Amino acid sequence: VFRYAETLLNYVEAINELREPYTLEMPNGSQVTVEHNTADIVKYFNLIRHRAGLPGITEAVAADRNKVRELIKHERRIEFACEGRRYHDLRRWGDAMEAYNRPISGCNVKARSNERQKFYTTTILNDKLTRRSFSYKHYFYPIPKSVLDKNKNLVQNPEWR
């Protein structure tokens, strides 16, 4: 199941990253050309923002690819919070090593009930249970041995050998 917001954000991200027009041949034989288009970026990004009662972006903002990329990353983080998409987003953007190799900060979940104020103090969580790591090899999944055995031309992904 794809949410409408995910479809819109995927489209905005794709057209923001296009460097040159791309033509697709459709099953009925017609062709559709997609290109970097700031008007579409504004239109579809703002559909998400406006339905939440938030201000949209302007054509001037949409003209800056890097700014739009950062806005998309931020919007996806909020729109899909607790939906399990963040890990794959970070991998796709190449941001996972930076994000997962730093300590987690947040509420002090170890504060006792009589230390209510300590709960709201931002704390670095750096114990065995909260420590995370991400290395280059995690950008790729290992190819199962059964698949490698069936096709001798396949080579295991880097660092999974």
What are these regions (language model features)?
Residues 1-44:
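C-terminal substrate/ligand-recognition segments
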Residues 1, 49, 59-161:
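Long, intrinsically disordered, low-complexity segments
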Residues 11-18, 44-55, 71, 75-79:
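Structured segments of extracytoplasmic/periplasmic soluble domains
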Residues 23, 56-58:
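A generic structural signal for short coil/turn motifs at secondary-structure boundaries
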